[in-house]
A protein has these predicted regions:
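N-terminal small-residue-enriched
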Residues: 1-459
Length: 459
């Protein structure tokens, strides 16, 4: 690692032709993957990513480059290359780094992984799935771990370090009978140490996944139509994340490409909806101590009782919007320039209970587990598959259904949410956008959406 004096010289040199801001992002990341299929290790790998990205700004104009030569000479040459984009007098002659005050939200007892214990746990998950029912034909369990150490330095005086240790265990079950083949999936993870990852009930985890795969074998095809839809907690929040969350990022808001642009203070959701993006939840999957621009992470209230309160803003788009950064600048690695991204994004708890929502639904669909989907970011129109669904009849959950697809528009859906339960839970995923693929939580309590379009092939 270079000295602060050397880093300061490189930043000043990058700004020597008129740029008004420069930033260095150093990264050392190790990624580990283990996959068990049935009772065999199918994959075990480890890779290392090491390098530095240099970003230079003049007003909104950005130049970005990266290298894995992090010596003074290597980064000096990178600064020489990027400064060719500008042709005016220097505005910055020196950099004085400041001590940063912050609160750490992710802490680790150890950065070690016991791979013998890990493989034994993954094999036991697969074994439990296969033993659940004779119709189970395949079980897979995987581990993904990423130990990332970063340093961010810029001409504003920021010199900040962070260590992230995201780990996740996921499993999939495949069942088959004479009529169809079905599957179940779930995952558990966080930004925490290996002991915390192991302190989880993986026996119950495996049984729930297997139960979904078996239940869906006897499910009938969903009949398309308009229904009141009860969307369960945790990964049910993927609809808000995809259809609304991305439209609240400054990446689209700043350029007036979002239907939420210029809507601060306006009603955009029903009164029962409060939505939050919180990068400070202790040791959560999408949490950080600092964002990837060196700013302390924050809890951002996006929507409060239906009123739009805030956007997620990175430093560059803050210039265009003339608003402060909200600590939302994130990137996959040093090979990507940062932009505004979500962290742990969820609809907050409401005043109803799960039981009350079901009891107050005369006829509808209970979407217990969500699958994949697609969203048009310009309009917010979406469709998402329901991986585990049930009919609701006379206030009771009855028979299972499969093949249901939820179809709607993000801004319309927000206004049609009329009940929110008190059982908030989060789900774990990887989110892709301009600055690459990053860990992000989605989440919500159980919610009810009135008069929702549901696709299906049933009769």
């Amino acid at each position: 690692m270079l000295t602060k004096d050397e880093i300061g010289k490189i930043l000043v040199e990058a700004c020597s032709t008129g740029a008004d801001f420069a930033e260095l992002y150093f990264e050392d990341t190790t990624v580990s993957n283990v996959r068990i299929i049935q009772d065999k290790v199918d994959e075990s790998s480890a890779t290392n990513l090491y390098g530095c990205g240099l970003r230079v700004l003049k007003d909104m104009e950005e130049a970005y480059g990266y290298t894995n030569d992090t010596s003074f000479d290597g980064l000096w040459q990178l600064a020489q290359n990027l400064k060719q984009n500008y042709h005016s007098k220097p505005l910055i002659s020196a950099v004085s780094f400041q001590e940063q005050q912050r609160t750490d939200h992710t802490t680790f007892g150890s950065l070690a992984v016991d791979y013998d214990q890990l493989c034994a746990t993954l094999k036991q998950i697969a074994k439990t799935i296969l033993a659940y029912d004779s119709r189970m034909i395949q079980a897979a369990a995987t581990y993904q771990g990423q130990l990332q150490k970063i340093t961010v330095c810029n001409t504003n005086g920021v010199f900040a370090n962070d260590t992230r240790f995201i780990q996740r265990i996921a499993a999939q079950a495949v069942s088959k009978d004479e009529n169809s083949m079905q599957s179940g999936f779930d995952s558990y993870g966080g930004n925490f140490d290996f002991k915390a990852l192991m302190d989880y009930d993986y026996d119950e985890f495996a049984k729930k996944i297997a139960q979904t795969a078996i239940t869906m074998l006897t499910a009938k095809e969903m009949k398309g139509g308009v229904y009141d839809v009860v969307i369960h907690n945790a990964f049910g929040g993927v609809i808000f994340h995809e259809a609304c969350g991305h439209s609240l990022e400054a990446t689209s808001v700043a350029k007036k490409l979002s239907f939420f642009s210029d809507k601060l203070g306006e009603k955009i959701a029903s009164d029962v909806v409060t939505a939050i993006d919180d990068g400070t939840i202790a040791n959560e999957w999408g949490s950080q101590n600092i964002d990837d621009e060196g700013n302390p992470q924050q809890k951002r209230v996006l929507i409060e009782n239906g009123i739009l309160k805030s956007y997620m803003i990175d430093m560059r788009n803050a210039r265009r919007m003339k608003m402060p950064s909200t600590g939302s600048g994130r990137r996959q690695s040093y090979r990507f320039s940062p932009t505004s991204r979500m962290s742990n994004t969820y609809i907050a708890n409401g005043s109803s209970t799960f039981e009350e929502i079901i009891q107050n639904t005369k006829y509808g669909l209970f979407a217990k587990s969500m699958g994949g989907g697609s969203v048009n970011p310009a309009t917010g129109e979406y469709n998402f598959s329901v991986s585990e669904g049930y009919l609701i009849e006379d206030g009771k959950i009855t028979e299972p259904v499969r093949g249901a697809t939820l179809i709607g528009n993000g801004k319309d859906t927000l206004l049609k949410i009329d009940m929110v339960a008190d059982n908030l839970s989060l789900g774990y995923g990887m989110c892709g956008s301009l600055s690459g693929s990053i860990p992000a939580c989605v989440g919500q309590p159980t919610i009810r959406v009135k008069a929702m379009t549901v696709g299906g092939k049933g009769e």
